[in-house]
Amino acid sequence: MADITDIKSIMYTEKSLQIQESGVLVVQTSPKVSKNQLKEVFKEYFGFTPVRVNSLRQAGKIKRFRGVEGKRASFKKFYVKLPEGAKIESLAV
């Protein structure tokens, strides 16, 4: 089962702030979290079940510095549609 610690961060990009107005929250998690586990986390910790959850895997970028090649970590991104009137006060911008 997933825990609240599996949510790495809330993404604040131009796109995520635009769709946040329509009640969609963009969440970055570890790649092992599933849609159902994320729904359970929202129900347990925030007191509501999301209307819809869409997910995608984001591959880590290859970065080079002074001839040494490295890779950023891969992550999973979720688009969580909140129910009408639901707010998460601690995550407000």
Swiss-Prot record:
Give UniProt keywords alphabetically: Ribonucleoprotein, Ribosomal protein, RNA-binding, rRNA-binding
- Recorded coiled-coil stretches: none
Looking at the keywords, is Repeat present? no
Q: Which InterPro entries match?
A: Nucleotide-bd_a/b_plait_sf (IPR012677), Ribosomal_uL23-like (IPR013025), Ribosomal_uL23/eL15/eS24_sf (IPR012678)
One Gene Ontology MF term: structural constituent of ribosome
Question: In which domain of life is the source organism classified?
Answer: Bacteria
Q: Name one GO biological process term.
A: translation
UniProt cross-references to Gene3D superfamilies, sorted A to Z: 3.30.70.330
Q: Name one GO cellular component term.
A: ribosome
Q: What does this protein do?
A: One of the early assembly proteins it binds 23S rRNA. One of the proteins that surrounds the polypeptide exit tunnel on the outside of the ribosome. Forms the main docking site for trigger factor binding to the ribosome.
Q: How does it assemble?
A: Part of the 50S ribosomal subunit. Contacts protein L29, and trigger factor when it is bound to the ribosome.
Q: Which family does it belong to?
A: Belongs to the universal ribosomal protein uL23 family.
Protein name, entry field? Large ribosomal subunit protein uL23
